[in-house]
Each structure stands twice: as structure tokens, then as C-alpha cells.
């Protein structure tokens, strides 16, 4: 099956530096950008400013990243062309800027693309807000109504608080708001199907074509073991158990047992028991 996963990026500039650095990546074959560093610097700054103004808890998400595993047959193709084809496909479909890199892991067993994308687009013109009266911001960057709310007991403005005077710019936007579709399940499902089809276009043997994993099938998915994963042995053992179930399911199908019956056993013997185990902890 194809392997495509998505993650949130609280530090997009740091992540871009990491995936595109030959000094930090042992097997880096190609990099590609659809926008320059200024775009990503501005995106990160505006995302943090908006997050501060919102007063929301947790981490500020500046961008998102896809990891797309490629079959080893792809090592035969020109790396830069592969990377640009996959990145341009995303930009064509969703109209957002991207940075990407094509890697092998240290043992050269996992050929994959990192594709970072923005959830926002540049506005045609910056949206600049001018203060019609004095505007006050507290230490967290949150706007407050009165000067009194940022004044200390000594009558002075508290450290870290700011005042924007009438006629000055108090807020500016270079970007649109985030596109909500990128955090919804249908988007990731669509991306998986789209990239699986793109991968298969360059695999001549139909028997080697990849499929998007169907969670409603008789099979169990295996998990990717990342670099320096402290749970590597545990995941490997779990994968072995899952592969044993998948072989058993294959044999059952070949021997003529109906798929519905296998799904019933999968539900009662695996999903239900795991659910009960979690609830009893």
C-alpha cells in the first residue's frame, strides 16, 4: 500500500532548513521551492501574530507537511524531475506555495518526499489597518480596550505592552486566512488517492501498483518505523503480528471463506478486544 502522512509544523522555517540541508541530511537528492525565503519568513511571522491576537492555547501551526513514500523503482528516475512533478501537482491542485525535498533514510531503505505547504495564500494587496484612535496591546500581544489595562501600579506602561497611536498602522496582513480544508479528513484522503495514482503512472508492472489502504478491508495496516524511534522493537513486533493476520486473511480468502465472515472475526477478535483493553486501563 502507499504511505502518505501529514503533520503540523509549529516552526516552518526550522523545518525547511532541516529537510533542505545537505549538512543535516545524509542522503539528500533534490530540493525545490515555489516561493522564496521571504514568503516563508512573512508567513511564519503573520501566523504567530495572529495566534497571539487570538489568545488561543497550544502551539501556533505555521504550515503543514506531507511525507510521501516512493517505491524503490523511483530511484531509477531523475530525482529533480520526480520532485518537481510531485510538488507541481500539489500546487496545481491546491494553489498554495510549497517547499520540498527528496531523501533516502540512512540505511537507504526508504525513498521519500517531504512536501511542506502553506495553508494561506498571498493577498493581491496587503491589508493594512490604520488606528482611528489609540490601540493598546498587553504583554502577550493581545489587544485590550483601555490604556489602564496595560498600566502598572506605578502609573507606567508595563514592560512588553505597546501603544499604537491614532493614524499609525496597528495590524497588517499579507496573507489570507487559513484554508480549513487542509485540516479535514477528506483532504488527506484525496491527497492519498491523487499521489497513489501519480506514483502508479511510472510503475510499468500493474501487479506492483500501489493502493490506498482501505481501513474497512480484511487487512491490518503496518506502521512505519522512523529514524531513532525508541519504540522500534515494539513497533516491529506489532508489525509482525499484523503481517501474520494479513497472511491468515489471504489464506482464508483463497480457501473460499467469505470476506464478510473474515471482517466479522476481525471486528470481534481484534477491534472489540483492543477497545475493551483501552477502556479497562
Kindly label every feature range from the protein language model:
Residues 1-281:
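N-terminal nicking endonuclease/strand-transfer module with a His-rich metal-binding environment
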Amino acid at each position: 500500500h502507499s504511505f502518505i502522512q501529514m503533520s503540523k509544523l509549529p516552526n516552518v522555517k526550522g523545518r525547511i532548513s532541516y529537510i533542505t540541508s545537505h549538512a543535516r541530511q545524509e542522503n539528500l537528492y533534490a530540493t525545490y521551492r515555489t516561493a522564496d525565503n521571504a514568503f516563508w519568513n512573512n508567513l511564519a511571522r503573520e501566523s504567530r501574530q495572529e495566534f497571539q491576537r487570538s489568545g488561543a492555547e497550544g502551539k501556533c501551526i505555521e504550515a503543514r507537511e506531507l511525507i510521501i513514500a516512493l517505491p524503490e523503482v523511483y530511484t531509477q528516475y531523475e530525482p529533480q524531475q520526480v520532485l518537481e512533478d510531485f510538488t507541481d501537482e500539489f500546487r496545481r491542485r491546491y494553489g498554495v506555495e510549497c517547499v520540498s525535498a527528496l531523501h533516502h533514510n540512512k540505511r537507504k531503505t526508504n525513498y521519500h518526499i517531504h512536501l511542506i505547504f502553506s495553508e494561506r495564500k498571498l493577498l493581491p494587496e496587503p491589508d493594512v489597518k490604520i488606528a482611528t484612535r489609540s490601540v493598546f496591546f498587553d504583554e502577550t500581544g493581545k489587544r485590550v480596550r483601555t490604556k489602564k489595562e496595560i498600566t502598572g501600579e506605578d502609573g507606567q506602561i508595563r514592560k512588553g505592552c505597546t501603544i499604537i497611536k491614532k493614524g499609525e498602522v496597528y495590524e497588517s496582513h499579507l496573507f489570507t486566512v487559513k484554508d480549513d480544508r487542509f485540516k479535514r479528513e477528506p483532504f488527506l484522503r484525496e491527497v492519498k488517492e491523487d499521489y497513489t495514482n501519480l506514483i502508479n503512472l511510472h510503475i510499468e508492472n500493474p501487479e506492483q501498483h500501489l493502493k490506498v489502504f482501505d481501513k474497512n478491508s480484511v487487512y491490518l495496516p503496518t506502521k512505519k518505523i522512523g529514524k531513532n524511534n525508541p519504540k522500534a522493537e515494539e513497533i516491529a513486533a506489532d508489525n509482525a503480528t499484523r503481517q501474520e493476520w494479513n497472511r491468515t486473511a489471504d489464506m482464508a480468502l483463497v480457501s473460499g471463506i467469505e470476506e464478510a465472515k473474515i471482517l466479522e472475526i476481525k471486528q470481534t477478535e481484534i477491534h472489540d478486544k483492543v477497545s475493551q483493553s483501552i477502556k479497562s486501563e
